[in-house]
């Protein structure tokens, strides 16, 4: 089984799920990690990386995938100061290469990272899940930020892309992004990638961009990685084997017109990292994240996994957002990153993969 199963871990003191817990989940070999206290634009120092490496290696895991080294806003906006932050990013790549890192997941979304309107939405069976209610996403970004910050303040839990430091300067950020059109954002992404590709080759590290979540413009901000055409443009814009994708089935399938399995088959050789997430759609455009089992949503998890299997996928894969189960809830669990549903998702994914392996063996006779 060539694919490598990973688990996103937020670090000691920052994640209720311990490395000891993860060690007990069959099939997990890789910890997907980051230095979550580092702000975009800062250099990840050797001693900081070493501390996390020692923790991960003590449990026999590899640390091949980083999610994420965030891109500074000056790079996305295209300010004259961007070159300084690009140099810092290059140094991060060099430092990470000393620890065997092979893939850096990142995104190029303006201001916000992922966006949801309810972090613990009841789904009817006693569990909760991340939920997106389209009517709540108006032009008033402050109410959305206030909602996320209420969890940060009450439970002392920060969320990637919604850090208090960023939320404190939202008005300033929106003003800075005001002149940035979608085409300008594409230009700035290309500039960034062309600048770092030589370093990626030097260090043998693939840059793997995550699709925009959700895959449409919000709060008047442009989004780039939203559909198959955008992915085609991205990969041809910088046609380099180190310019890759973190293909997120859930982010893309928030728009039911996106056929994730087709995208996998077309670009499998440029997918370095796969996120497997299931989505349940509502007729009004709302969506709720669902269990990984195929019939629990409309992503087509079996067809997505079949596409990876048929392509001989040898990259890294992890269960993406799961539901919060049993005693998990606000204060005891990161929204979407509970222990139980992701562990269940892994076993489902591995079961599908094992069956596909068996079917291939039977065909060979």
Q: What is each PLM-predicted segment?
A:
Residues 34-50, 219:
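Glycine-rich, proline-tolerant flexible connector loops at the mouths of alpha/beta enzymes
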Residues 28-34, 64-66, 106, 209, ...:
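Non-cysteine beta-strand/loop elements that form the S-adenosyl-L-methionine
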Residues 65-99, 103-122, 127, 134-145:
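Acidic/aromatic-lined carbohydrate-recognition and catalytic surfaces
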């Amino acid at each position: 089984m060539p694919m490598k199963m990973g688990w996103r871990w937020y670090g000691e003191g920052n994640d209720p799920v311990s490395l000891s817990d993860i060690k007990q989940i069959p099939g997990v070999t890789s910890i997907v990690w980051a230095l979550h206290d580092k702000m975009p634009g800062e250099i990840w120092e050797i001693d900081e990386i070493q501390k996390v490496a020692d923790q991960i290696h003590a449990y026999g895991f590899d640390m091949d995938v980083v999610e994420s080294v965030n891109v500074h806003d000056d790079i996305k906006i295209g300010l004259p100061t961007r070159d300084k932050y690009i140099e810092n990013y290059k140094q991060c790549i060099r430092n990470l290469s000393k620890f065997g890192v092979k893939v850096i997941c990142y995104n190029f979304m303006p201001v916000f990272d992922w966006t949801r309107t309810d972090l613990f939405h009841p789904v009817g069976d006693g569990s909760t899940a991340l939920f997106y209610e389209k009517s709540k996403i108006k032009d008033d970004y402050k109410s959305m930020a206030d909602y996320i910050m209420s969890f940060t303040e009450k439970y002392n839990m920060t969320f990637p892309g919604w850090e208090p430091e960023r939320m404190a300067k939202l008005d300033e950020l929106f003003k800075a992004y005001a002149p940035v059109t979608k085409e300008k954002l594409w230009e700035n992404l290309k500039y960034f990638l062309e600048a770092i590709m030589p370093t990626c080759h030097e260090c043998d590290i693939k840059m793997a961009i995550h699709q925009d979540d959700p895959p449409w413009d919000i709060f008047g901000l442009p989004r780039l990685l939203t559909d198959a055409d955008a992915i085609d443009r991205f990969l041809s814009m910088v046609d380099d084997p180190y310019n890759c994708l973190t293909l997120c089935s859930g982010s893309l399938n928030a728009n039911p017109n996106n056929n994730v399995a087709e995208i996998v088959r077309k670009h499998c050789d440029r997918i370095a990292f796969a996120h497997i997430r299931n989505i349940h759609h509502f007729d009004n455009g709302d969506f709720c994240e669902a269990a990984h089992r195929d019939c629990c949503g409309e992503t087509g998890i079996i067809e997505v996994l079949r596409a990876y299997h048929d392509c001989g996928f040898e990259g890294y894969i992890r269960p993406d957002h799961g539901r919060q189960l049993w005693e998990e809830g606000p204060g005891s669990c990161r929204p979407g990153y509970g222990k139980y549903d992701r562990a269940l998702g892994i076993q489902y994914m591995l079961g599908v993969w094992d069956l596909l392996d068996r079917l291939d063996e039977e065909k060979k006779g």
